[in-house]
């Protein structure tokens, strides 16, 4: 949104006077604010005053950094509907600027009409003329008016001054007309941009905030000494509003089937239909914004008071178009999976996403279309994919994202870059025009702002915009969330409908004020260890202290001693349980059998892990074998065959293994019962038929054994049953 070092620069605090390309004289002054509270007055005021706040709540090197910028009571508003753009002075300061704007528009060839009034200028663009595809963005449109305004105020050395606001979906039809089926409401606007003269900028990383104020001199006078202000435009709750969706049950699935038929005909490659969820909302928009920002930080966050009681609250994950110094960037997102219950669950979901052929195809098609968009306005050979299928995590979702760049060719500007991508394939489909016609024919309501963009058009020639998705539109007491899914030929109708609902979930919670819930934690182990003492025999192991920690979580008191000292301590300490740790080498290297004998002589229960199981097998006359390949740090599904240690656990568990030795099934002692095995029959757990002895070959303390809290639950059973003397009863 602005250079990373801007707020730290001493030059910003020095008054600056410059002249724009169109002859407007500008004076800039900046003052320091308390970064802890700088934005709060802006956010609170946006409940009733026109304005906007843009922020980024995430860090992604090379793509995003945390920052924020906001304002209220802008001087000028630019509003478009169809091919007409209205420019309004919102206060006395805006009235100083309006004559200069009118002068800049007089004689503009792209206009069919221009009306001037003291506080308003209305410009109507001419009908488009046929142009080569490379010049499509130069067709007469409301953007012709925007380009003239940008040229009037052009100031290459100021990175903050510009137009801020939102662009609606229907703007694309000025360049790609389609047959419109859906009736557009009378209050729909296609564009709303503000020209602010007071901005608050925050750099949370540097801990800096600045109020940046501008004064203007035009032929009509100076803004110096004129008050900032404007009318109230509050949100009006409606206690009679009802929740709902613009798709009845089964409707979206039928859209998916219709799309699949279009894919088979070759009409479409992909398409992204949406559905809108409505929630009554009595809370202030600022409250919804604060909840959403806290629960779902995103690269493109926005809170916009659009006037007329309409608001946007956004936490968009996707860059639309960013332009700086002639470099054009986009970050198309496609490929979605739900977050896991914890970090291990996330890892499994990331793997699922990255190995999904459908999700890979989704993003590939999006990026190929995106590259084509850039090729229209960029230098030959400059369009490159600089990031491929990168993972981004959000509160409920995991996405894959590409990063694409290009260099604008001579004669092209930021608006050309903006328009060539309208609208992003990630919210429309491909081929774009056919996809947009499909959306018009099958969606149940107009998109309004959804699928468009919001952000900044800079007077320095730059641009930073986010795609308008994961955005709440609030009006007349109702909050609306629209969400879509990318459909391909192999789409499952129910899964695509579920994806829409998943994408909308965090936003519906923010509307309702529903807490997302605390971060998931591992299930607590049974407290069977309360009051019990454990001696943990360390066989030079690298995981022994994690194992001790798990045992302590059962309430037990644990003492860890190296194998060379542990046996002598047995008689002195008389623990309630002896635990034989994993370790390198063979059981004989540590005389594990001797430790077991010493424990049995004292009547102490023994539990073994990995090497401990191998030592137990050898102690009772069994034999070990060497695996064809070591299994170190590998996850394995084991099948539970019974036994007290697995009481209450599922029949199949995923566990972590670190071993190259294994008990020979054909030489297993008759006194030992196998209670768990791998799919190919390898021994994974044993229990003694008469004595309080049990062991597992896998590592219950490994992160690979975290799934469902299996490792902790098993050790809870160890304390509850083995240490308590209940194991032999169960084994018998």
From Swiss-Prot:
<protein>
    <recommendedName>
        <fullName>Anthranilate synthase</fullName>
        <ecNumber>4.1.3.27</ecNumber>
    </recommendedName>
</protein>
<dbReference type="InterPro" id="IPR006805">
    <property type="entry name" value="Anth_synth_I_N"/>
</dbReference>
<dbReference type="Pfam" id="PF04715">
    <property type="entry name" value="Anth_synt_I_N"/>
</dbReference>
<feature type="active site" description="For GATase activity">
    <location>
        <position position="699"/>
    </location>
</feature>
<dbReference type="InterPro" id="IPR005801">
    <property type="entry name" value="ADC_synthase"/>
</dbReference>
<dbReference type="GO" id="GO:0004049">
    <property type="term" value="F:anthranilate synthase activity"/>
</dbReference>
<dbReference type="Pfam" id="PF00117">
    <property type="entry name" value="GATase"/>
</dbReference>
<feature type="active site" description="Nucleophile; for GATase activity">
    <location>
        <position position="610"/>
    </location>
</feature>
<dbReference type="InterPro" id="IPR017926">
    <property type="entry name" value="GATASE"/>
</dbReference>
<keyword id="KW-0028">Amino-acid biosynthesis</keyword>
<comment type="pathway">
    <text>Amino-acid biosynthesis; L-tryptophan biosynthesis; L-tryptophan from chorismate: step 1/5.</text>
</comment>
<keyword id="KW-0057">Aromatic amino acid biosynthesis</keyword>
<dbReference type="InterPro" id="IPR006221">
    <property type="entry name" value="TrpG/PapA_dom"/>
</dbReference>
<keyword id="KW-0822">Tryptophan biosynthesis</keyword>
<feature type="binding site">
    <location>
        <begin position="583"/>
        <end position="585"/>
    </location>
    <ligand>
        <name>L-glutamine</name>
    </ligand>
</feature>
<keyword id="KW-0315">Glutamine amidotransferase</keyword>
<feature type="active site" description="For GATase activity">
    <location>
        <position position="701"/>
    </location>
</feature>
<dbReference type="InterPro" id="IPR015890">
    <property type="entry name" value="Chorismate_C"/>
</dbReference>
<feature type="domain" description="Glutamine amidotransferase type-1">
    <location>
        <begin position="533"/>
        <end position="728"/>
    </location>
</feature>
<keyword id="KW-0456">Lyase</keyword>
<dbReference type="InterPro" id="IPR019999">
    <property type="entry name" value="Anth_synth_I-like"/>
</dbReference>
<feature type="binding site">
    <location>
        <position position="614"/>
    </location>
    <ligand>
        <name>L-glutamine</name>
    </ligand>
</feature>
<feature type="binding site">
    <location>
        <begin position="660"/>
        <end position="661"/>
    </location>
    <ligand>
        <name>L-glutamine</name>
    </ligand>
</feature>
<dbReference type="GO" id="GO:0000162">
    <property type="term" value="P:L-tryptophan biosynthetic process"/>
</dbReference>
<dbReference type="InterPro" id="IPR010112">
    <property type="entry name" value="TrpE-G_bact"/>
</dbReference>
<dbReference type="InterPro" id="IPR029062">
    <property type="entry name" value="Class_I_gatase-like"/>
</dbReference>
<dbReference type="Pfam" id="PF00425">
    <property type="entry name" value="Chorismate_bind"/>
</dbReference>
């Amino acid at each position: 949104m602005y250079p990373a070092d801007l707020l730290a620069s001493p030059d910003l605090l020095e008054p600056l006077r410059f002249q724009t390309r169109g002859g407007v004289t500008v004076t800039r002054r900046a003052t320091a604010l308390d970064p802890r509270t700088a934005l709060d007055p802006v956010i609170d005021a946006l409940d009733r005053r026109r304005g906007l706040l843009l922020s980024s709540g995430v860090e992604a090197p090379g793509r995003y950094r945390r920052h924020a910028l906001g304002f209220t009571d802008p001087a000028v508003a630019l509003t478009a509907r169809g091919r007409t753009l209205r420019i309004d002075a919102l206060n006395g300061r805006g009235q100083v600027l309006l004559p200069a704007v009118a002068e800049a528009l007089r004689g503009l060839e792209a206009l069919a009409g221009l009306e001037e009034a003291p506080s308003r200028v209305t410009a109507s663009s001419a009908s488009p003329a046929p142009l080569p595809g490379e010049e499509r963005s130069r067709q007469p449109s409301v953007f012709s008016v925007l380009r003239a305004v940008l040229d009037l105020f052009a100031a290459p050395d100021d990175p903050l001054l510009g137009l801020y606001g939102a662009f609606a979906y229907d703007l694309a039809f000025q360049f790609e007309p389609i047959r419109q089926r859906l009736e557009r409401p009378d209050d729909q606007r296609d564009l709303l941009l503000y020209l602010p003269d007071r901005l608050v900028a925050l750099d949370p990383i540097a801990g800096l905030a600045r109020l940046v104020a501008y004064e203007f001199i035009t032929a009509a006078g100076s803004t110096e000494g004129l008050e900032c202000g404007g009318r109230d435009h509050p949100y009006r709750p409606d206690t009679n509003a009802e929740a709902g969706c613009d798709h009845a049950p089964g409707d979206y699935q039928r859209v998916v089937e219709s799309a699949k038929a279009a894919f088979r005909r070759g009409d479409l490659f992909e398409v992204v239909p949406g559905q809108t969820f409505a929630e009554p909302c009595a809370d202030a928009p600022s409250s919804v914004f604060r909840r959403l920002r806290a629960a779902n930080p995103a690269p493109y966050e926005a809170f916009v008071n659009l006037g007329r009681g309409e608001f946007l609250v956004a936490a968009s994950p996707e860059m639309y178009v960013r332009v700086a110094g002639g470099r054009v960037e986009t970050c198309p997102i496609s490929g979605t999976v739900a977050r896991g219950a914890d970090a291990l669950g996330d890892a499994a979901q990331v793997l699922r996403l990255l190995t999904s052929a459908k999700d890979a195809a989704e993003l590939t098609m999006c990026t190929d279309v995106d590259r084509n968009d850039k090729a229209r306005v960029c230098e030959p050979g400059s369009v490159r994919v600089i990031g491929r299928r990168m993972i981004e995590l959000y509160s409920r979702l995991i996405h894959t994202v590409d990063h694409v760049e290009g260099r604008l060719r001579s004669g092209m500007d930021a608006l050309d870059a903006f328009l060539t991508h309208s609208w992003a394939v990630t919210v429309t489909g491909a081929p774009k025009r056919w996809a947009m016609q499909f959306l018009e024919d099958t969606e149940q309501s107009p998109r309004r702002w959804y699928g468009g963009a919001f952000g900044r058009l800079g007077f320095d020639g730059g641009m930073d915009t986010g795609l308008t998705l994961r955005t709440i539109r609030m009006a007349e007491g109702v909050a609306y969330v629209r969400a879509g899914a990318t459909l391909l030929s192999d789409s499952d109708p129910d899964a695509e409908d579920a994806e829409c609902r998943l994408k909308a979930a965090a936003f519906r919670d923010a509307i309702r004020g529903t807490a997302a819930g605390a971060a998931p934690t591992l299930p607590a182990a049974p407290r069977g260890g309360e009051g019990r003492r454990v001696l943990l025999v360390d066989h030079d192991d690298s995981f022994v202290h994690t194992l001790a920690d798990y045992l302590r979580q059962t309430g037990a008191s644990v003492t860890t001693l190296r194998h060379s000292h542990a046996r002598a301590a047995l008689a002195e300490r008389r623990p309630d349980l002896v635990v034989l740790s994993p370790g390198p080498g063979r059981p004989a290297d540590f005389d594990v059998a001797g430790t077991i004998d010493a424990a049995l002589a004292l009547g102490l229960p023994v539990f073994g892990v990995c090497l401990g199981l191998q030592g137990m097998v050898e102690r009772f006359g069994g034999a070990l074998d060497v695996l064809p390949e070591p299994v170190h740090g590998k996850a394995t599904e084991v099948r539970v065959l019974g036994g007290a240690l697995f009481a209450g656990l599922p029949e199949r568990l995923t566990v972590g293994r670190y071993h190259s030795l294994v008990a020979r099934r054909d030489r297993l002692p008759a006194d030992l019962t196998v209670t768990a095995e791998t799919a190919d029959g390898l021994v994974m757990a044993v229990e003694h038929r008469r004595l309080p002895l049990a062991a597992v070959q896998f590592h219950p303390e490994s992160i690979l054994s975290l799934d469902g809290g299996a490792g902790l639950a098993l050790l809870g059973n160890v304390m509850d049953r083995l240490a308590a003397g209940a194991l032999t009863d169960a084994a018998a």
